[in-house]
């Protein structure tokens, strides 16, 4: 009995010892829980680079906004391409204005803002580009062709008109009032280069045109910068002798009317003598320099008793008035 009791006691102690070895202590339980939390935290950190892991916490609109932001490099490339396209379109506009200015000068037409927009700017082009395109075209004309665009302001001849004429709304000068401000090309080359035959275009029509123009301007200049129609017509008829038309292939009256429309002459009705009076126009004063007029008069009126000092003084006054009005 005593042996059995001993054995039973031994078994109880063994089971108790086994139970003590298997059952974890409180400190072990806490350590195991902390280790488990640490493992889960590390797994979350490893998966944080994947956008899909945040699906439950990120709204669908937020993911859409993130996708719409696009690649910064792609946006920069698109921006550069757009700037390059704008630069190309700008240069095309500049070249169009340069071509139009040269063609207008060749055909003796004035250059107006309205015509530039209609003929040099494609449909749909912003009018806000006009000033910058015009300035760049002027710069390229100077660098490549030796010309610059000069503003011309229509002369105000009301001070020279008779009182009865001022009361009439329609005048010959009013027909060109739409050209109260326009541009023409003027050479920036030195005078010796302008006279160089190698740089002068050999054109019979241009030579005849400018010859007739300079003759008319010179005659008006030596007549104290104004002359009546009958006196000017008589002078031109003597030069043309038996010819019925001028070098412009028009009769005298129509030729003078053409020069008025082109801005080289101003024409005012004189009720006192019932005829037109011609003045040197703003365009002629702008394009024909004082030195150019003096050279022409000296060459083609060598035997005349013209007072060149008085002539140049009057013409210089007209030139200065035009220069100041153009600058304004």
Curated annotation (Swiss-Prot):
Region called Disordered, residue ranges: 1-80
Cellular component annotations (GO), alphabetically ordered: nucleus; Smc5-Smc6 complex
Main location: nucleus
Modified how: Sumoylated by nse2.
Biased composition (Acidic residues): 31-54
InterPro entries: MAGE, MAGE_WH1, MAGE_WH2, MHD_dom
Keywords: DNA damage, DNA recombination, DNA repair, Meiosis, Nucleus, Ubl conjugation
Gene3D superfamilies according to UniProt: MAGE homology domain, winged helix WH1 motif, MAGE homology domain, winged helix WH2 motif
Keyword Nucleus: yes
Pfam families membership: MAGE
GO aspect biological process, one term: meiotic cell cycle
Protein name as annotated: Non-structural maintenance of chromosome element 3
Taxonomic lineage: Eukaryota, Fungi, Dikarya, Ascomycota, Taphrinomycotina
